[in-house]
Amino acid sequence: MKRTYQPNNRKRAKTHGFRARMKTKSGRNILARRRAKGRHQLTVSDE
């Protein structure tokens, strides 16, 4: 049986990347929350 997690960097960035987060209001909320919390890495793009 094929597992559910099939790693793919392009898909990862397009779904969870910084520009993807900036596109929606809720995505911008996520970034604001992570900034407020002091996360070193805001999105997967920051690796």
UniProtKB/Swiss-Prot annotation:
<dbReference type="InterPro" id="IPR000271">
    <property type="entry name" value="Ribosomal_bL34"/>
</dbReference>
<dbReference type="GO" id="GO:0019843">
    <property type="term" value="F:rRNA binding"/>
</dbReference>
<comment type="function">
    <text>Binds the 23S rRNA.</text>
</comment>
<keyword id="KW-0687">Ribonucleoprotein</keyword>
<dbReference type="GO" id="GO:0005840">
    <property type="term" value="C:ribosome"/>
</dbReference>
<protein>
    <recommendedName>
        <fullName>Large ribosomal subunit protein bL34</fullName>
    </recommendedName>
</protein>
<keyword id="KW-0689">Ribosomal protein</keyword>
<dbReference type="GO" id="GO:0006412">
    <property type="term" value="P:translation"/>
</dbReference>
<comment type="similarity">
    <text>Belongs to the bacterial ribosomal protein bL34 family.</text>
</comment>
<dbReference type="GO" id="GO:1990904">
    <property type="term" value="C:ribonucleoprotein complex"/>
</dbReference>
<dbReference type="GO" id="GO:0003735">
    <property type="term" value="F:structural constituent of ribosome"/>
</dbReference>
<keyword id="KW-0694">RNA-binding</keyword>
<dbReference type="InterPro" id="IPR020939">
    <property type="entry name" value="Ribosomal_bL34_CS"/>
</dbReference>
<comment type="subunit">
    <text>Part of the 50S ribosomal subunit. Contacts protein L4.</text>
</comment>
<keyword id="KW-0699">rRNA-binding</keyword>
<dbReference type="Pfam" id="PF00468">
    <property type="entry name" value="Ribosomal_L34"/>
</dbReference>
